[in-house]
């Protein structure tokens, strides 16, 4: 059970809201949330880092000097890893970093993460009608009224994202706006404050509640 304070547009407390989510057992919670987080971050990796071995570096086919008689250390190629400009030993090659995780586990991890952020979550009344046109300053001021600390990461969860709200928030560097049915574990965990509308909370209950 997640209990949250409901605030209006002016930042005044007008009630309470609750969210009932089935979460992981306490002894397993940290492990399953960690797995889901690592999976998401790994799946976002391009995996295209690449370095050339001594066989792939251009040149180096001719022996730089004869084997014996020069007094210098023997050398077979100017592209030896020991040489400047040579190949790389055990360097990275393009690879697939993606990890698999069962859908039930992913959803359990997300519900557990949401429930763990209850102390940092604020529910607000729907405010889309406050923006007849994009106003970045008004949205930034509203976030402060709702308890978000200046320059600290804020996750704003809406059931639908009105265009004027999106345009108002896209230039606020510390703000991330997501739909309630498109949450991810990284943004839920990394936000310092989570602000959700009452309708978004209902959507979360509908989509993720079990």
UniProtKB/Swiss-Prot annotation:
Protein name: Large ribosomal subunit protein uL4
Basic residues composition-biased segments: 60-71
UniProt KW rRNA processing keyword: no
Family according to the record: Belongs to the universal ribosomal protein uL4 family.
Function: One of the primary rRNA binding proteins, this protein initially binds near the 5'-end of the 23S rRNA. It is important during the early stages of 50S assembly. It makes multiple contacts with different domains of the 23S rRNA in the assembled 50S subunit and ribosome. Forms part of the polypeptide exit tunnel.
Known partners and oligomeric status: Part of the 50S ribosomal subunit.
GO process terms (BP): translation
Top-rank lineage group of the source organism: Bacteria
Keywords: Ribonucleoprotein, Ribosomal protein, RNA-binding, rRNA-binding
């Amino acid at each position: 059970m997640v209990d949250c304070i409901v605030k209006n547009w002016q930042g005044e407390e007008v009630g309470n809201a609750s969210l009932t989510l089935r979460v992981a057992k306490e002894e397993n919670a940290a492990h399953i949330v960690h797995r889901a987080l690592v999976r998401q971050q790994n799946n976002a990796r391009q995996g295209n880092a690449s370095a050339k071995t001594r066989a792939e570096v251009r040149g180096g086919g001719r022996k730089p000097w004869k084997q014996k008689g020069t007094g210098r250390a023997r050398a077979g190629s100017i592209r030896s890893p020991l040489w400047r400009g040579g190949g790389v030993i055990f360097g990275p090659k393009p690879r697939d970093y993606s990890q698999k995780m069962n859908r039930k586990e992913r959803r359990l991890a997300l519900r557990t993460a949401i429930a763990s952020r209850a102390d940092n979550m604020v529910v607000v009344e729907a405010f889309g009608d406050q923006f007849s046109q994009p106003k970045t300053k008004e949205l930034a001021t509203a976030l402060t009224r709702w308890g978000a600390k200046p320059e600290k990461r804020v996750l704003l969860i809406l059931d639908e994202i009105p265009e004027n709200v999106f345009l108002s928030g896209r230039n606020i560097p510390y703000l991330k706006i997501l739909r309630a049915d498109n949450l991810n574990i990284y943004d839920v965990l990394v936000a310092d404050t989570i602000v959700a509308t009452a309708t978004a909370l209902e959507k979360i209950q509908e989509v993720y509640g079990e």
